[in-house]
Amino acid sequence: MNSILPCQDQYFVGGQSYNCPYSTTTSESGVDVSKETWVSFWAAGLLDNTELQQAPQVLESPSELSFPVLDSCSWEEAQLSSQLYRNKQLQDTLLQKEEELARLHEENNHLRQYLNSTLVKRLEEKAKKLLSSDEFSKVFGKLRKEKRKPKEHRHSPAEIPQFKTAKRNLSTEFSNCEEQPGPHVDPWVLQTLGLKDLNTIDDTLPANYSATTSHPRAVPSISSLFVHDANGYANVPRDLHLDYVGQGTHGSHTTSIHQEDCHSFPRLSNPPVRVQTLPYHTADVSPNKTEMAFSTSLSPHCNVKTHSFHQGQAFVRRDEEGGWKFTWVPKQT
């Protein structure tokens, strides 16, 4: 059996260098070769016997060809492994969600127990009482009305606070308000004390120290006269000179102050003291005359004027700030 194979086949001897067909036989008994075939062989060169023996062996083993062949089993295994991995991930996610759901159920049960507790019930009862009260309804109603109104209409122009105007109106009210009437003071008392009124001192008019009788009376303890206003003064002189003035008679009398009386004047200096003592008036003497009056200089910037009446003693002195202080000490009966 003769067969003609192309010379371009790479598995034949000579490879692609043989461009002419040749005939070969597959039987072992004999080979029939034509002249054209032999001429072509001699022209191209004789083939080795080894190459002729190897050519049919190569043709007999086509399974050993190095063509790329896809393995279907390996492809299926790869697809299956990816699906298994995805299934594993879904199972893990499902377990996490189940654990979270169980935790939420537990928290929900705790909240229900707390809502059913007595504390929450008491708070609910108190809230109901507050909501049902009239005061809360009034306040809530006002708040709702304020919310319904626009911002520009919530306050009328008259209700808007104006601080400057309010201050000015307040000052006019204070200036226009009527003062409460105080106790009536006789003019002779103000003139004797050298006062224009209860709040103003008149330095231009001298005080009236005259008297109608010439019977002197003993002067009370000086410490009792200054117990309210002269605390804090020191060094009271031990000998106090008193100048008595009467109707046409003048005299001087010296008295000494006890040691315990000096303790009430710890800061009093040692200036000379001039005391004008007026006799005590009797029942037939008009009360417009003073019983006793004297003045003393406690310091260069502080003078105390003392006036004594049958009702008590009056003390007028200037303080450190330049003002005046008036003190009235009634007599003890």
Curated annotation (Swiss-Prot):
Ranges of biased composition (kind: Basic residues): 145-154
Annotated compartments: Nucleus
A GO molecular-function annotation: chromatin binding
GO biological process: cerebrospinal fluid circulation; cilium assembly; DNA replication; multi-ciliated epithelial cell differentiation; multicellular organism growth; seminiferous tubule development; single fertilization; spermatogenesis
Superkingdom, taxonomy of origin: Eukaryota
GO cellular component term of the entry, any: nucleus
Residue ranges of the region described as Disordered: 145-165
Keywords carried by this UniProt record: Cell cycle, Coiled coil, DNA replication, Nucleus, Phosphoprotein
Coiled-coil region: 83-118
Segments traversing the membrane: none
Main location: nucleus
PTM comment text: Highly phosphorylated by CDK2; stimulates initiation of DNA replication.
Family of this protein: Belongs to the GEMC1 family.
Protein task: Regulator of DNA replication. Promotes initiation of chromosomal DNA replication by mediating TOPBP1- and CDK2-dependent recruitment of CDC45L onto replication origins.
Protein name, entry field: Geminin coiled-coil domain-containing protein 1
Species in which this protein is naturally found: Mus musculus (Mouse)
